[in-house]
């Protein structure tokens, strides 16, 4: 029977991949690869727009956490915890507590069932936005509907005092703060 259990390791936000590599290197350099079966940083793809161009990037689903299937002993626990950018193991009374099977299954399901990229910015009905491109550039509008599949916003734009419905790509608008 395997003594490996899943643990959640808290990291500095944005350092999840660096911590993953550091843990992998730690077990390799010390010849204890058998104590680490798997290490996971759940991510999702998001669509961003930089300089008017669409870019797909990865975002951590659980910012600040790495999940590792470990045969954990006190020595390995302290070595991992002393790595740069590692906060602590999640647990009670300062002792690592393994994740429940239910919890890790929910996390792994998200890893294995990656969805299509989602826009990084979301819009809500009734929200005011500014149009940044196209014939209605610099107009303000109200979001009526959002079509996530097509990446379109249905907006109401006030033109010459009349409310006019228009469909615009979400990349052509920005939130008004």
UniProtKB/Swiss-Prot annotation:
Question: Locate the KOW domain: which residues?
Answer: 125-150
Which key words tag this protein in UniProt? Transcription, Transcription antitermination, Transcription regulation, Transcription termination
Q: Please give one Pfam family short name.
A: NusG
From the UniProt record, give one GO term of the biological process aspect: DNA-templated transcription termination
A GO cellular component term found in this entry reads: cytosol
Entries under PROSITE patterns matching the protein: NUSG
Q: Which domain of life is it from?
A: Bacteria
Q: What does this protein do?
A: Participates in transcription elongation, termination and antitermination.
Q: Which HAMAP family does the entry mention? A: NusG
- Which NCBIfam families did the record assign? nusG
Q: Can you tell me which family this protein belongs to?
A: Belongs to the NusG family.
This one is known as Transcription termination/antitermination protein NusG
Q: Which gene specifies this protein's sequence?
A: nusG
